Amino acid sequence: MCRSSNLEKYVFYDLETTGMSPAFDQPLQFAAIVTDLELNEIERVDIRCQLSPHILPAPQALAVTGVRPSQLQNNNLLSAFEFSQKIQIFTEKWAPAIWTGYNSIAFDEAMLRQMFYQNLQPNIFATQFHNNTRLDVMKMVFAVHAEEPHILKWPINAKGKVNFKLDQLAPENGFRAHNAHDALGDVEATIFIVDKIKKQCPDLYQKLFDARDKERNLQLLKSFTPVEVTLRFGGSSPKTYTGCYCGLSKNSKNMVGFFDLEKPDPMELIHGTQQDVLDAMTKSPQRIRSLRLNQAETIRPASISNPEWRHTCDVIKDDTAFQTVVSECLADKYPQTEDTDSVVEEKIFDGFYSNHDKTLLVQFQISSWQERLTLLNDAQDNRIQQLGHRLIAFNAMHLLDPKYIARAQEFIVEKWTASETEANWNTIASVQRQLAELEASGFDNILLDEMKTFY
């Protein structure tokens, strides 16, 4: 059953950031509008923060958002640490809620998660836990395009393909007040699109709304009845696939096998070898797809069915050996490996913190910087110690001994001067390349000169 009540509400949100990497960029703006389920506004917030000392913003990102270098150095803004604290409090205030954005699962949520992690917030997964659910409106739009394309107008790009970007889709459908690439403007545009889907196609809207809850989705899949999901790969058009649950990865409770019911000869695969199953996952055409329950996919009951599909589902349900093979093949396809050379930003999923460290992080929020430095000596997880000393270097450097100060300064120099081919973050070399590309494209000279002076 879906979790729903009269108190349930949406939190529509968006971020503007220094670049595209959740691990190595940062949010500069967080905007959100809380509504009831009828999309009546309850509250809105619009928060900005300073640039962290170790981050070089991508010139191309500044060009898109229109953020001026002077805004990045505004000392009246919150620090990144204070910014993350304020957003964490906001998530707690409105839980449980339906956290909703446009392409939010792939981008905004990952950015939020990293921001909480790197700024030592107690609840890294704040939008996913505490009975929160999630919707990604871009995925809803994909389902509309595949199932009910007449209810929206579709902007076409230079290649003759549909442009699903919000800054194109919203104006094409009548949203005239869109301040594109401003977080609050994008939130308003997202609500506009949801409202249009809700009014124009209430049946499909309800199915997509019900898919917000991953526990409900797992129950639906494990009913071994035909279900459908709309997916988009690369630049292709979204397509709805009809299939059946066929196993849960032995390595991840969030990954399931999805058996394509529209492909021929299902029994041949069900009674085949383990290699046949692995081939069905890895070779084209795919007969078994992997779905991630924590990615807000648009899983819903199949709109049509037939006796053959239902029979295939029944066979899979009874064939636990086949489900076991699928479970093992999913684990083989997506092995869990530990990268011992990864930097701390990339270790966000290296296990949950102990209860001791969780309690420490709660205390960290209400302590002075001097007290925070002392608390770090008690942390069991090396990630907390490393990120914590970085925070103190950025926010209260006077508390550190010369050894740590020198190390912090060396860290920034090494980060900025790293080889562009080896770094996953913005470096001086990548910044200079992007500035040259903007200049060659005829970008606004005034803003470009400001950028050059800033860098």
Feature roles, as predicted:
Residues 2, 196-321, 414-455:
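Acidic two-metal-ion nuclease catalytic site recognized across multiple nuclease folds
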Residues 2-79, 249-254, 263-284:
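Conserved RNase H-like, two-metal-ion catalytic cores of nucleic-acid enzymes
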Residues 13-17, 84-87, 241-242:
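Short alpha-helical segments and helix-capping/turn motifs at coil-helix boundaries
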Residues 24-30, 34-65, 91-202, 208-211, ...:
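Metal-dependent phosphoesterase core characteristic of DEDDh/y 3'-5' exonuclease domains
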Residues 64-148, 303-306, 311-362:
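Conserved DEDDh/DEDDy metal-dependent 3′-5′ exonuclease domain
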Residues 68, 78-80, 165, 206, ...:
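General structural signal for secondary-structure boundaries
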Residues 77, 81, 106, 184-187, ...:
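Generic detection of long, well-ordered alpha-helical segments
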Residues 250-418:
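Long, charge-rich C-terminal accessory regions
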